[in-house]
């Protein structure tokens, strides 16, 4: 799976975290592992321009998704022929997201992870224009984000334990006899 990130926002963000959450969602949603995804991070002026051009709405927004193909909710871009398929583009605005994060009482990284999940779900055909669609999409979004966070916490604790084990083994070598 290829995920390309281009940060043109001027704000330092963890690109590896964005890739991690996108890769997790794509895997959990059974998308073809050869799928390609592009993520672009823009400043508010560029996002406002994109928002007006594509949605005819003034001002910036947090995330926009541009699927390569129209997909049904839960659908996949699997194709019978070999080769990668282009899932689409997710455009994020970290500056706008930072304001939302502050209002919600969490970090920019947490907000961008949420928006990445949201963007991938849009690429897979999910929408929230109608109340029933919103309920389904937001429940799935919450579930996927919680699972990804749990996986990150587990990996962190495993890394910590491995580091403790390594230090303990290093200390025990002092007592080894030749």
Swiss-Prot record:
GO biological process: rRNA processing
One GO MF term attached to the UniProt entry: metalloendopeptidase activity
Residues bound to Zn(2+): 118, 122, 128
Family indicated by similarity: Belongs to the endoribonuclease YbeY family.
Subcellular location: Cytoplasm
Co-factor binding comment: Binds 1 zinc ion.
InterPro entries, per database record: MetalPrtase_cat_dom_sf_prd, YbeY, YbeY_CS
Enzyme Commission numbers on file: 3.1.-.-
Protein species of origin: Mycolicibacterium gilvum (strain PYR-GCK)
Protein name: Endoribonuclease YbeY
Function, as annotated: Single strand-specific metallo-endoribonuclease involved in late-stage 70S ribosome quality control and in maturation of the 3' terminus of the 16S rRNA.
SUPFAM superfamilies cross-referenced by the UniProt entry: Metalloproteases ('zincins'), catalytic domain
The protein's required cofactors: Zn(2+)
Alphabetical UniProt keywords: Cytoplasm, Endonuclease, Hydrolase, Metal-binding, Nuclease, Ribosome biogenesis, rRNA processing, Zinc
GO cellular component: cytoplasm
PANTHER family recorded: ENDORIBONUCLEASE YBEY, CHLOROPLASTIC (PTHR46986:SF1)
